Amino acid sequence: MKGPWLVLAALCLSLANLGPRGEDGLDFPEYDGEDRVIHISLKNYKAALKKYEVLALLYHEPIGDDKASQRQFEMEELILELAAQVLEDKGVGFGLVDSEDDAAVAKKLGLDEEDSIYVFKDDEMIEYDGEFSADTLVEFLLDVLEDPVEFIDGSHELAAFENLDDEPKLIGYFKNEDSEHYKAYEDAAEEFHPYIPFFATFDAKVAKTLTLKLNEIDYYEPFHDEPITIPSKPNSEKEIVDFLHQHKRPTLRKLRPDSMYETWEDDLNGIHIVAFAEEDDPDGYEFLQIIKEVAEDNTDNPDLSIIWIDPEDFPLLIPYWEEKFGIDLSRPHIGVVNVTDADSVWMDMDDEEDLPTVDELEDWIEDVLEGEVNTEDDDDDDDDDDDDDDDDDDDDDDDDDDDDDDDDDDDDDDDDDDDD
């Protein structure tokens, strides 16, 4: 979580109630002024962990003396206070840990990244790597409160499972909840909860529909219809965890508000292949289907990972992205972005009538992976432009010098005439 995101989030909070009052049932919560966020110290951290089913801690850098730093911290606190108010009856607590004043308790709890939120539930610690806004944080914590494994008992639950295609998911078929193999599956689910959904069924008909054998676990990449079966069933917790770590970077993944920083930091050699497409837009939807087909065709390529961003999920970032990348987000785009300096190169799609075909997109991606398309080339072009500008300046200087010499000669001639 970075400073600008906090400012935008707080702005959203302040603007939420500027409109006319809604009817009963549609009123957004307003902060009631009660202090619920606690300062965590060596004296009270154990009591706080026992008191709350879920405890969310903001590990922050020391507050600066300047007005801007203090104002920003106040906005961060406001976000936490509103979230704490909304989730008060759910058994969720919120706290603050200063990285300097509370270094001892931070070390005991394993907090190491400033401006991050750490969530504690049972014996698990989850780092929240999403947008710092009250609504996104509340949604994430409600997911944390859910059980790590969701059961599929019939056709309706099965349909919901099949419709979930924009994030990785697992499903296993077990004898019952008392099965040792299910227990291992459940323990693995707790380690990835709530970022990766785990499903289980004890129903033979559901298992048959999914072509699952007893104690078998299938893993689905995002946007893939065909699963990968975890080998060597029945699987231990370690085998499941190791498998997911090996497959942690899907071929195509969606940038989501609740995990956006984690996704962005997981780059390949300092770059991301980024696709912008609005799913609700006809062109965006068509382009997304092309990208999905390319991803499924290349699912075995460990060097390929595409991040899909639906601009509608991040409306406050649209002007920034358009200015930074020099693209119009009302149209689909795919390009290479350097994660260090955000330099980018975008696939040429000037023809508004035709989107690239699957083959054309695969050829472009192949050029990217082979290094023929990269952001350094764009830098070289900029350098060439600068060199051209310098040459022009030199030419202008030479011309000016020549003009000055001519003027001097004219002056000398005039002086000679005067002497005569």
Swiss-Prot record:
Tissue expression per record: Detected in skeletal muscle (at protein level). Detected in skeletal muscle.
Signal sequence region: 1-22
Keywords for this protein: Calcium, Endoplasmic reticulum, Glycoprotein, Membrane, Metal-binding, Mitochondrion, Muscle protein, Sarcoplasmic reticulum, Signal
Residues carrying a glycan: N338
InterPro entries named in the record: Calsequestrin, Calsequestrin_C, Calsequestrin_CS, Calsequestrin_middle_dom, Calsequestrin_N, Thioredoxin-like_sf
Gene Ontology terms describing biological process: positive regulation of release of sequestered calcium ion into cytosol; positive regulation of store-operated calcium channel activity; regulation of skeletal muscle contraction by regulation of release of sequestered calcium ion; regulation of store-operated calcium entry
UniProt xrefs under Gene3D superfamilies: Glutaredoxin
Coiled-coil residue windows: none
Membrane topology (UniProt): Peripheral membrane protein
Region (Disordered): 369-420
Keyword Transmembrane helix applies: no
Subcellular location: Endoplasmic reticulum; Sarcoplasmic reticulum; Sarcoplasmic reticulum lumen; Sarcoplasmic reticulum membrane
Entry GO MF terms: calcium ion binding; identical protein binding
Mitochondrion as UniProt keyword: yes
GO cellular component: endoplasmic reticulum; mitochondrial matrix; sarcoplasmic reticulum lumen; sarcoplasmic reticulum membrane; Z disc
Record's subunit section: Monomer; increases in response to a depletion of intracellular calcium. Homodimer. Homotetramer and homopolymer. Can form linear homooligomers. Ca(2+) ions promote oligomerization.
Function recorded in the entry: Calsequestrin is a high-capacity, moderate affinity, calcium-binding protein and thus acts as an internal calcium store in muscle. Calcium ions are bound by clusters of acidic residues at the protein surface, often at the interface between subunits. Can bind around 80 Ca(2+) ions. Regulates the release of lumenal Ca(2+) via the calcium release channel RYR1; this plays an important role in triggering muscle contraction. Negatively regulates store-operated Ca(2+) entry (SOCE) activity.
Family from the record: Belongs to the calsequestrin family.
Full protein name: Calsequestrin-1
Organism of this sequence: Pelophylax lessonae
Phylogenetic classification of the source organism: Eukaryota, Metazoa, Chordata, Craniata, Vertebrata
